[in-house]
Amino acid sequence: MGAILVVLALLSLLGLGSANLNPLDHDPCLDFDPENCTLTFAPDTSRLCGVLIKCGWDCRSVEITHNNKTWNNTLSTTWEPGVPQWYTVSVRGPDGSIRISNNTFIFSEMCDLAMFMSRQYDLWPPSKENIVAFSIAYCLVTCIITAIICVCIHLLIVIRPRQSNEEKEKMP
């Protein structure tokens, strides 16, 4: 009995026993849902609508295809009337198999809404008046954010307790 225990101990120390088995790494591509993508819309020109499609940052083998453009994980494309209202998401598994999902989305309604909202608030198409307003607003917001950061850094430096080594040694 003692000899068997010695042999098992030596096998486990040498890595030949079952005590040294490593669990398989979890592949995020196995759980990836090709239909769970994020779409963002913005006016690109007076007629085109910019579309940003993001899918699966955890899985590197995701390919998105729309209007003959293919890219990994994020695809920036444009939509206009006549362009297909679907995009394809394909995920390559660890065994080489490919899962494909053809997603149909209401590009026309979302782009119409984005264009309508930008036109309603005179944000699109750009004009001299709103470009100047945007530039001034951008400069003001940048100055405010910079001031907030400077105040925070100043407060961090001023409020931080300054204890010398002698004071630390006197503490109980």
From Swiss-Prot:
The keyword Lipid biosynthesis does not apply. It comes from the Viruses. Residues 1-19 form the signal peptide. It is a single-pass type I membrane protein. Keywords: Disulfide bond, Early protein, Glycoprotein, Host endoplasmic reticulum, Host membrane, Host-virus interaction, Inhibition of host adaptive immune response by virus, Inhibition of host tapasin by virus, Lectin, Mannose-binding, Membrane, Signal, Transmembrane, Transmembrane helix, Viral immunoevasion. Glycans are attached at residues 36, 68, 72, 102. A motif (Di-lysine motif) lies at residues 168-172. It is found in: Host endoplasmic reticulum membrane. Disulfide bonds join 37-55, 49-111. The chain crosses the membrane at residues 137-157. Binds and retains class I heavy chains in the endoplasmic reticulum during the early period of virus infection, thereby impairing their transport to the cell surface. Also delays the expression of class I alleles that it cannot affect by direct retention. Binds transporters associated with antigen processing (TAP) and acts as a tapasin inhibitor, preventing class I/TAP association. In consequence, infected cells are masked for immune recognition by cytotoxic T-lymphocytes. The lumenal domain binds directly to the peptide-binding domain of class I molecules. The di-lysine motif confers endoplasmic reticulum localization for type I membrane proteins. Belongs to the adenoviridae E19 family. This is Early E3 18.5 kDa glycoprotein. The lineage of its organism: Viruses, Varidnaviria, Bamfordvirae, Preplasmiviricota, Tectiliviricetes.
